[in-house]
């Protein structure tokens, strides 16, 4: 997404020529004719006639420089961006109490990161608009400050974009402050070089070359090529992310289950395509591209913070504090007595949980079933009926095994049950009811009083 500011309404668009600085400026000046292939592209008179087309193109250029009446030097462009952002900031202030309460009761670093991005982006945008309105735009230093503010706000927005993608695609692996910091550093490695190139392209002294006596001085074609390529690349990235559920990549990353994330990606694809088309039209010396640039840039700097809020934060902030089923929440399951997290190799195969393989559930030492613990020697001893002992894992057809995973560490009942079960010889196949898993992936069977020796 490009940057539009007073001295540069769109990436690589040069300084604005106004009636205050150009005596030859005339409000009734006719609009320069576009190339023939551009005129052919917009020549469908069933939708828009040539006169209306010229008016629209003129409006797309005027909106960046015209100021409010009454002696104020406030541009319509700044006011149009400021008012929606002020309304959204008021909305955020009204939600501030509930947001703080949610952040204090919850333990989600991703939620805090998204909240910070929304508030900071909105505040920086408002500060830029207010400061731009106070500038006379006649001093070169003030113009440079205004350009710098636009670069800063673009940097914040671009970083927020990459953070949203990172949190959305890797939310199952980002559940602590350190992982959030690593993800943020990764996004900075992309946004900082992009912003540096943008500064080099935009902060240049340019001349009035091919569009005389009109609003804009256009820089060299290299800036537009960078603009087209950067916008097209971002559009391809978002489009590829939208296609991830259709390819095998979903085996390696946990994608958001709801559709709001993909709607967000679709909107960003549309905005970046409009930016790329607008830059391409301006590259071919057509002022029609200013309409594409103006619309996409306005939507971006006005609606992006609300899009982030309603896509990633609204549902999570409305959930009760004890609900851990947020969009970007992932936690290990705790055992019943709170003795710690379950092992990383724990893949239960019950409804609502994911298991890569049913065999992984029973991935443990086979010989452990045929040993018992000798208290006198403090070690496990192989059962004498090693070759004849058989305990197949067959569920009874009469009763259904209880879907309960027992994770009590150091349970005396389990040790007593295991020793009693292994101490009695088995001459044939017996059916036992599997209750669940014990410590270290061991099996826990239903109590069978007939097999226990007191």
From Swiss-Prot:
The chain crosses the membrane at residues 80-100, 113-133, 151-171, 180-200, 224-244, 262-282, 290-310. The gene is tpra-1. GO terms for cellular component: plasma membrane. Coiled coil: none annotated. The keyword Glycoprotein applies. PANTHER family: TRANSMEMBRANE PROTEIN ADIPOCYTE-ASSOCIATED 1. Residues 445-454 have a biased composition (Acidic residues). Residues 410-421 have a biased composition (Basic and acidic residues). GO terms for biological process: G protein-coupled receptor signaling pathway. Disulfide bonds: none annotated. GO terms for molecular function: G protein-coupled receptor activity. It is a multi-pass membrane protein. InterPro entries: TPRA1/CAND2/CAND8 (IPR018781). Keywords: Glycoprotein, Membrane, Transmembrane, Transmembrane helix. It comes from Caenorhabditis briggsae. This is Transmembrane protein adipocyte-associated 1 homolog. Glycans are attached at residues 26, 44, 258, 322-323. Belongs to the UPF0359 family. Residues 408-454 are annotated as: Disordered. It is found in: Membrane.
């Amino acid at each position: 997404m490009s940057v539009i500011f007073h001295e540069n309404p769109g990436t690589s668009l040069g300084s604005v020529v106004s009636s205050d600085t150009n005596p030859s400026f005339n409000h009734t000046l006719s609009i320069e004719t576009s190339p023939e292939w551009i005129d052919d592209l917009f020549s469908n008179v069933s939708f828009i006639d040539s006169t209306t087309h010229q008016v629209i193109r003129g409006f797309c250029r005027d909106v960046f420089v015209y100021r409010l009446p009454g002696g104020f030097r406030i541009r319509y462009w700044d006011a149009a961006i400021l008012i929606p952002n002020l309304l959204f900031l008021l909305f955020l202030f009204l939600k501030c109490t509930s947001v703080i309460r949610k952040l204090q009761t919850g333990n989600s670093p991703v939620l805090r990161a998204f909240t910070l991005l929304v508030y900071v982006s909105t505040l920086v945008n408002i500060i830029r608009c207010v400061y731009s309105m106070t500038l006379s735009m006649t001093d070169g230093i003030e113009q440079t400050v205004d350009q710098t503010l636009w670069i800063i706000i673009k940097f914040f927005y671009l970083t927020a974009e990459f953070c949203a993608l990172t949190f959305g695609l890797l939310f199952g692996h980002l559940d602590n402050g350190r992982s959030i910091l690593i993800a943020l550093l990764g996004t900075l490695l992309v946004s900082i070089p992009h912003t540096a190139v943008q500064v080099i392209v935009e902060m240049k002294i340019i001349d009035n070359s091919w569009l005389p006596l009109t609003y804009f001085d256009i820089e060299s074609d290299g800036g537009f090529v960078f603009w087209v390529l950067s916008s097209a690349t971002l559009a391809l990235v978002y489009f590829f992310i939208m296609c991830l559920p259709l390819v095998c990549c979903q085996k390696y990353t946990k994608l958001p289950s709801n559709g709001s994330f993909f709607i967000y990606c679709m909107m960003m694809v549309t905005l970046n395509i409009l930016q790329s088309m607008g830059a391409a039209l301006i590259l071919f010396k057509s002022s029609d591209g200013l309409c594409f640039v103006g619309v996409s840039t306005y939507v971006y700097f006005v609606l992006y913070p609300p899009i982030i809020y309603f896509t990633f934060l609204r549902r999570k902030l409305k959930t009760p504090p004890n609900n851990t089923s947020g969009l970007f929440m992932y936690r290990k399951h705790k055992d019943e007595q709170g003795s710690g997290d379950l092992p990383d190799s724990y893949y239960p195969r019950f409804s609502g949980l994911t298991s890569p393989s049913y065999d992984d559930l029973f991935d443990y030492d086979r010989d452990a079933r045929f040993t018992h613990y000798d208290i006198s020697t403090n070690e496990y001893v192989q059962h004498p009926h090693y070759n004849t002992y058989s305990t197949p894992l067959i569920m009874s057809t009469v009763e259904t095994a209880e879907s309960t995973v027992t994770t009590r560490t150091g349970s005396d009942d389990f040790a007593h049950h295991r020793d009693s079960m292994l101490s009695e010889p088995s001459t044939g196949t017996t059916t036992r009811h599997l209750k669940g898993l014990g410590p270290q992936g061991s099996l826990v069977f239903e109590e069978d009083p007939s097999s226990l020796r007191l």
